Amino acid sequence: MKRRVIKMATRASDMHLLNVPLSQPHFFDPHSAWLRHGPFGMWLVHALRPRRIVELGTHYGFSYFCFCQAVAAGDLATECFAVDTWQGDEHAGFYGEEIYHRVMAHNQQYVRFSRLLRKTFTEALDDIEDSSVDLLHVDGRHFYHDVKADFENWIPKLSPRSVVLFHDTEVREHGFGVWQYWAELAAIRPSLNFPYQHGLGMLFWGKEIAEGLAPLARTLTDTERLNWPVEYFALAGESYVRDATQRGVIKRLELAEATIEERKAETVLVQQKLQEARRRPLKQLKRKLVFNMLRAAAKASPPLPSRTAERFRRSAAKRDPMRDDLQTLSGQGFMTYEAVVRGWGKQRQALAGRLSELVRRLQNGPLISVVVPVYNPDPALLVEMIESVRAQSYANWELCLADDCSTDPEVGRVLRNYAAQDPRVRVVFREANGHMSQASNSAIEIARGAYIALLDHDDLLDPDALVLVVQVIDAHPDAKIIYTDEDKIVEGGTRCDAHFKPDWNRDLLYGINYISHLGVFDAALVREVGAFREGFEGAQDYDMLLRCIERVQDRQIHHIAKVLYSWRATPGSAAASNRAKPYANEAGRRALEEHLARTTGKSIPVVLGPIPFSYRALWPMEGTPLVSIIIPTRDHLNVLRATVESILGRTMYGNFELIVVDNGSVEADTLEWFGQIEGSDRRVRVLRDARPFNYSALNNAAVAQSRGEIVALVNDDVEVIAPDWLSEMVALAQRPGVGCVGAKLYYPDGRIQHAGVVIGLGGVAGHGHLLYPGEHAGYFCRLKLRQNYSAVTAACLVIKREIFDAVGGLNESELTVAFSDIDLCLKVRAAGYNNVWTPWAELYHHESASRGHEDTPEKRARFRREVDYMKRRWKTHDFADPAYNPNLALERNDFVLSSPRWCISTKLT
């Protein structure tokens, strides 16, 4: 009973006694032994207002990021330093690079004042001035002599007002000696020990007591109140852990429910396919019979009247077996890849004459050197690969194979036999095994072609792969890099998992090597960059590609939207064994980091991404520019208040103004709240604009009255999820060549609302991946990676003000409500900028919660006018969106296959 009274007294007197409000950490690490100390750590920073914080031993970073969050929230002029080797020790355990990369990624939002010193504690002494550290946290090795040496080495760095924290003051097993050394220090200086969660000792080392810590210091000499701070912060820690755990449980439940719904949908789809498979033979037979009858009728003798014969011909064409059941499948909402491949085969048969003409026209085109490193493939698969090259419709090629000391004698026999029978097959036998890079370079050394095509020793080329590559070269003589779509081939020869890629997409490439196969490079360019480098095995293609793009212009990179390469995906294949090696992931990360250093002149950290062989560049911010967040609204206070409070309370980036544009609110509680919020937070302004609703005009007028270098257009029905959302978007918007930056938006139930806009989807523009489960990786992991899109939604859009002004802002005459953000993005793109979508700026979006839907005749008429404008201005109905692929359907949002359209392109990218 007495303990309960103490808790109540603490709650009632905390502001009087401790003088500083509490906050909860945003960063949650279930591994941390510091969890319950998080609120105290943040309180300490607010109370002490240190000039410099140093943490010795950071590991996962929970305690350190508590300090950083408090610095950012309080807008303090504090420098923070985390010192760690990030290799581990006997007590923390030893670990790999993944923890350091994770810490680097989270630190990105604090780079303005936070530095990670990857050094020993002794080495880091040279980085810190004497008498400059106000807060030191000692959490390194825990043996008595180690903690004693760590602290005493750093005493010269401590300021006259310094406070020192020691973790694990209550642990007495495993040889820990912090408790023993803590007892010695506590006997000579004022101190407070928090005995829960391994123990945290707070030592007033400096003779001066900071003003914010004075109330706490006074309790140390007051026996009546001595336990109050411990009780107070213990309760705060328990509350934080409980809340954070509850949020985690809820998120896992939502994910589980979404997964169940996804499985249900998959089950329905399988059932539909089974039913269709049962009906298909009868439907095909019926189609063929009707087709033959109609075709015969059209050719009847004596001839039918021309109009009647034409009607029969059209009816027959609709039932042509060449079309098979493809349109039916597509109309039912799905398209199997097997059906698409069948359709391509039939369509190519129909185009045989045109293909032959193309081959004849290009027969004097450039020599293509197909480069293949060889090491112990299955001899049968090696033969298949060679035959796929020899079967090319384009004849001006050579096959350059470098055997990397294969131990299977059958491999050598196969290579020698082919070299003897076909002079275009050239083989070099290496004297020592040098792995993929050296073997590829040996093949390149004997290559004589103007272009080099890269092929693995067990993969397959489409028979028309090279002629279609040469068609691009013929249309674009300055082409330097050409890539195609690809699929996989499994045991038994089944083709699957087709990857229909976007056109050149720099930001996607910085996240993953989406270009992959088939890659064709200008031979002089390959030699200029030094071909493949040793030390990047497993990511050697990615490394060379990155070095090549440094020397070419974007317009010299071309994409053929056809599957011309089949990647062998069987156990033991070159691709499978290569990607199974863990060092390949790290090699790719290093390749990108070096590329960014060469191209920017800066050290830009790169961390491993959320999926294997993916990466995230931690783009730095250039200072902390003022961001003007523009939010138009009208009444619906419950929605607006949630938006504003989430931005003010959860956003790590501190230098922003929030401009609420009131478009004629009349509700009393809304008007009252406007006055309250303006008076309580200096960052908030309310602009009155009572004109008839015109989304574009409201935003344009607010931007004109804003002060920020960066503009953020935000709807009044969003809620912040990721505290670093604005830091991420600002850092991207500051990059040279970047225009609009879009966020990852979720519906309240966790499904995807926005992950980039595809032009042409649904006729004008639509959201790709709409309604996907929130944790889904998306089409070839595109929900997890930054990438360029033609457009992003202005429900949360960040752009430099100078770019916004240069393109004329939003179109307030033709696009008053719908599509004005799409139009803005397309104008920005036409001005030469890339628009970027990022998955690391996450918010909820209730979508039209305050404005409503197009549910009146007037609104529907206005919407039709805006659709017509977009079709006239941007030809959205015929827009080949470079972020999409013509093999994917425009009728749906989920990147499903379209009906097969295998044609010989006249419009080449």
UniProtKB/Swiss-Prot annotation:
What cystine pairs are annotated? Answer: none
In the record, biological process GO terms are:
single-species biofilm formation
User: SUPFAM superfamilies per the record?
Assistant: Nucleotide-diphospho-sugar transferases (SSF53448), S-adenosyl-L-methionine-dependent methyltransferases (SSF53335)
Q: List the protein's name.
A: Uncharacterized protein y4gI
Query: Does the keyword field hold Signal?
Result: no
Q: Which organism is it from?
A: Sinorhizobium fredii (strain NBRC 101917 / NGR234)
UniProt KW Transmembrane keyword: no
Q: Which InterPro entries match?
A: Glyco_trans_2-like, Glycosyltransf_2, Nucleotide-diphossugar_trans, SAM-dependent_MTases_sf
